[in-house]
Every structure is written in C-alpha cells, then in structure tokens.
Amino acid sequence: MHIERHEIGPRFSEMTVVDVGTGKLVFIAGQVAENTSLDIGGQTREVLGFIDRLLQHVGARREHIVSARVYLASVGDYAQMNAVWDDWVVQGHTPARVTVGAKLINSAYKVEIEATAAFTPKDGHDHAHDDNCEKPHASGDLR
C-alpha cells in the first residue's frame, strides 16, 4: 500500500490518495469557498469546482465519489445548496451523503464539503505522482 499526500500543511493535507493495489482511494479535505462574498449557491459551485480540480489531478472524476459530507452554516440554505449539488452530481453515481448544520471555522463560509472517491486508473499514468498539482484555493490558511 502506498499513500500520497497533496498540498501538505502543518495541520492537514488537501487530499490524500491511498493506492490499494488495483485501485485508489482519494480522501479530499473539507473544501470552502475562496470568494466568501458569494451566496450559498455561488459558494457551493466554487467548492464543487475545487473538488473537481483535485479529483482531476489524480485522474478521477466526480462519478468516482463514494461518500460526501456537507456542512452548512445555516440549515435554511439546504434547498439552495441541493439545487447546485443536483446540477453537479452525476445521476446514477450519487454518493452516500450526509448534510449537517455546523458552525464553520470562519463565519463568512456558508458551506464546507469533504469527499471520498474510489477509482481504478485507466490510462496507465499514475497522476498521484505528478508534482504540478496547483493549490485550488486558500482553505482559510488553517492547514
């Protein structure tokens, strides 16, 4: 078994990839919006874009997500967040998901999403060893 960590900080990594033989498990840390002036729909879109970019870096796609955890600063934003989620998620490949109301670390954050994906690399290239993974966002500089 081999473990790769990406965008390593003193407290956490943005993403961890575990090679489990013929496949990989991808653990994405909680992602938050960079542009905190956006409404819940905008912040959700931005966060899901960060997740897409991290998955893409290792050769995975959103349909490989097997589990997601959504944290909302206001449970009143549930319907609006779901509208964006429903447009983004791949039908027929919806992951197990939990959504909870939570006091987020920065009061300007409206949503935080973490995800776990599982996939088998198809192209023979191990993207997890690429060194050009750009940091998708600031993540509150709390790593």
Question: What do these predicted regions represent?
Answer:
Residues 1-66, 72-143:
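N-terminal presequence-like segments and the immediate start of the first folded domain
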